[in-house]
From Swiss-Prot:
Residue numbers annotated as active site: R148, K172, H240, R243, H266, Y275 (o-(3'-phospho-dna)-tyrosine intermediate)
Record flagged with keyword DNA-binding: yes
Domain spans labelled Core-binding (CB): 2-88
Gene Ontology CC terms: cytoplasm
Lineage summary: Bacteria, Pseudomonadati, Pseudomonadota, Gammaproteobacteria, Enterobacterales
Domain of life: Bacteria
Keyword Ligase: no
Name listed for the protein in its UniProt record: Tyrosine recombinase XerC
Subunit architecture: Forms a cyclic heterotetrameric complex composed of two molecules of XerC and two molecules of XerD, in which XerC interacts with XerD via its C-terminal region, XerD interacts with XerC via its C-terminal region and so on.
Example GO biological process: cell division
Length: 298
């Protein structure tokens, strides 16, 4: 085993023992670092001390020429930077040779939104089954508030203020925000809460699976896709498409970009991390005036 391999093995043990990363994450790191080991060996390197920024750039170019996409290259360089940072912390390197090397930005492909008529058709589902009531409530909340999938499945009953028509969500970066959800969503949440105890009452989660546990993201994706087919929509229905539709419809109706951005938990629609700070009353007024389905009761 070369010094290149030895250092990587030490780093992976550190990630496993000290950082307690999951096996899947460890495997991803291992794959990315094996690629740089192979490239470094081909170029005659015996140790990481011989690696410089030129070699890292050449490695990035080679990876792209072999068909690695922009997102994949960004992941690979991120793993490499983290590894070299660790070597610096261990006094094995004086500086991180990958620090100034960045991957080209991956183009953003926003999903096609569902138009208002198709959204009405999607939401007009048969509610004879309690699980259908739950799904209708999830669809209404997802579209009514533009939630991320993780925010939807993470909702607890305590996060609701149905009298005010509001919900608290924990977004990316543990940023909490209060959102209006509209009277349609409130009505369907109340309908679901009347049936929820059929599946279990011990879990704090708002939305439960048929086994009485917090519903999983995969289950939500599956159910939404099934409803899209049942309701005759031409496009595949998935949670992010509802979030995108929320944003599109709100912007078309209001033109208030900053208000919609705040409702989404973004500084802008390209999901940059610069947050604006609008007061909640303004957000509520934007919502009340613009959303095509979920105008709140006063």
């Amino acid at each position: 085993m070369t010094d290149l391999h030895t250092d990587v093995e030490r780093y992976l043990r550190y990630l496993s023992v000290e950082r307690q990363l999951s096996p899947i994450t460890l495997l991803n790191y291992q794959r990315q670092l094996e690629a740089i080991i192979h490239f470094a060996s081909e170029n005659g390197l015996q140790s990481w001390q011989q690696c410089d920024v030129t070699m890292v750039r050449n490695f990035a170019v080679r990876s792209r020429r072999k068909g690695l996409g922009a997102a994949g290259l960004a992941l690979r360089l991120s793993a490499l930077r983290s590894f070299f940072d660790w070597l610096v912390s261990q006094n094995e390197l004086k500086a991180n040779p990958a620090k100034g090397v960045s991957a080209p930005k991956a183009p953003r492909h926003l999903p096609k939104n569902i138009d208002v008529d198709d959204m009405s058709r999607l939401l007009d589902i048969d509610i004879n089954d309690p699980l259908a009531v739950r799904d209708r409530a999830m669809l209404e909340v997802m579209y009514g508030a533009g939630l991320r999938l993780s925010e939807l499945v993470g909702l607890d009953i305590k996060h609701l203020d149905l009298e005010s028509g509001e919900v608290w969500v924990m977004g990316k970066g543990s940023k909490e925000r209060r959102l209006p959800i509209g009277r349609n969503a409130v009505a369907w949440i109340e309908h679901w809460l009347d049936l929820r105890d059929l599946f279990g009452s011990e879990d704090d989660a708002l939305f439960l699976s048929k086994l009485g546990k917090r519903i999983s993201a995969r289950n939500v994706q599956k159910r939404f896709a099934e409803w899209g087919i049942k309701q005759g929509l031409n496009n595949h229905v998935h949670p992010h498409k509802l979030r995108h539709s929320f944003a599109t419809h709100m912007l078309e109706s209001s033109g208030d970009l900053r208000g919609v951005q705040e409702l989404l938990g973004h500084a802008n629609l390209s999901t940059t991390q610069i947050y604006t700070h609008l007061d909640f009353q303004h957000l509520a007024s934007v919502y009340d005036a613009a959303h095509p389905r979920a105008k709140r009761g006063k």
